[in-house]
A protein has these predicted regions:
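N-terminal secretory signal peptides and thylakoid transit peptides that target proteins
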Residues: 2-19
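Phosphate/pyrophosphate-binding betaalpha-module
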Residues: 200
Length: 369
């Protein structure tokens, strides 16, 4: 795996691409610090069950013991998250790999420090009782999208690869808070989604769906990466690495202790449990996420590991099908990805068997999409 090795000098010296502006420069003192360093961190979406591992890591002191006070904020889509991190509005965050790669091609100063899951589960959801059964059925129908979502940017590419006339779609921008509800209530015929975020909304409300996965036409990407700006990383590499280390430990906790992780998340986010199906909604998001955390990368190399060859391949897909003519060619993954915290948090074979067994029905759900 020598081609996947990244030197500190090369990683830190990679210049910001294009015209992205860097906001406030952050730099923390290097000596031992009595008080934890506060780091602002944005999620890519609402703090649903899929992010239980991040909150569990904070609750269990995985950041604190490393001298970090992680201030977590909700997100408004992956494109919004990586833009905010690149300009310094947040020091770190997480966003979908496909959106991150597109952002880098468009000039965002981003560095990817780890991978949280290995299938972004992008696709289109329609009600099973409705008229959409195949990709071609989308023509002439309304489709809701979240403007800043990491999934939305790949809709034209999906249409092209699936043989759909994109001009025959009626695309409607919808607030992310009511995206799924707009489909359930019939405001739109379908919605572009990240399955991990949206499927729980439908299942918990006992609404049968048809899912048209982007992966069936070759648009398959990693889920979330930990992101930061090159400017922040150059000045605070140890801090950024410690955040990633805490996240890796949080992932292990959620994989091995799903029930406690669920209870902890519901306790911190009581509003998510409101309503008769609130707990089920959170549980579904968490369990689907546990399912995509298990892959050859994490099993063989440890939690958080990023296969740079796969990132390069995904970048080529983004460039070919989602980039604009003005977007630059993707740089080599080794210039903006790091595995400095990989191979430090691992599971035994027996533990992975436990994860595989406990996520079987959720992997089947994702596989049936």
């Amino acid at each position: 795996m020598s081609s996947n090795k990244l030197t500190r000098r090369r990683f830190l010296s990679t210049a910001a691409i294009g015209t992205a502006a860097i906001g406030t420069g952050f730099s923390f003192p290097r000596p031992a610090i009595a008080q934890p360093i506060q780091v602002s961190y944005t999620l890519s979406w609402l703090p649903t069950g899929q992010y239980a591992y991040v909150y569990a890591a904070r609750q269990l002191g995985y950041f604190k013991k490393r001298g970090i006070d992680l201030d977590i904020s909700r997100g408004f889509g992956s494109m919004a998250a990586n833009q905010a991190v690149s300009i310094g509005k947040f020091q770190m965050g997480s966003a979908q790999a496909g959106a991150n790669l597109l952002g880098i091609m468009r000039g965002l100063d981003l560095r990817l420090l780890g991978t949280h899951g290995y299938d972004a589960t992008l696709g289109i959801v329609a009600l099973k009782k409705g008229p959409i059964k195949t990709p071609k059925d989308l023509e002439g129908r309304t489709i809701g999208v979240s403007a800043a979502g990491g999934d939305t940017v790949f809709l034209p590419a999906y249409c092209k690869l699936a043989g759909i006339d994109f001009d025959k779609l009626k695309v409607v921008q919808i607030d992310s808070k009511i995206l799924e509800q707009s489909a359930m209530s019939g405001v739109v015929d379908s919605v572009v989604v990240t399955g991990l975020s949206s499927i729980p909304n439908f299942i918990s409300e006992d609404v049968p769906i048809t899912m048209l996965p982007f992966s069936t036409v070759g648009l398959q990407f990693y889920w979330l990466n930990t992101i930061t700006s090159g400017d922040f990383l150059e000045k605070n590499k140890e801090v950024a690495d410690q955040v990633q280390a805490g996240i890796n430990e949080g992932m292990k906790f959620m994989l091995l202790n799903p029930q406690e992780a669920l209870e902890r998340h519901l306790k911190e986010h009581e509003e998510l449990a409101l309503g008769k199906n609130g707990k089920l909604y959170v549980e579904l998001g968490m369990e689907l996420t546990r399912a995509i955390m298990m892959a050859s990368e994490s099993v063989e190399h440890g939690l958080g590991y990023t296969d740079l060859a796969k990132i390069d391949a995904q970048a080529k897909v983004v460039k070919q099908y989602a980039a604009k003519p003005t977007d630059r060619d993707p740089p080599a993954a080794e210039t903006f990805c790091s595995n400095s915290q990989a191979e430090q948090v691992t599971l035994t074979s027996a533990e992975w068997d436990q994860v595989k067994s406990s996520t079987k029905k959720y992997r089947e759900l994702l596989g049936s999409l």
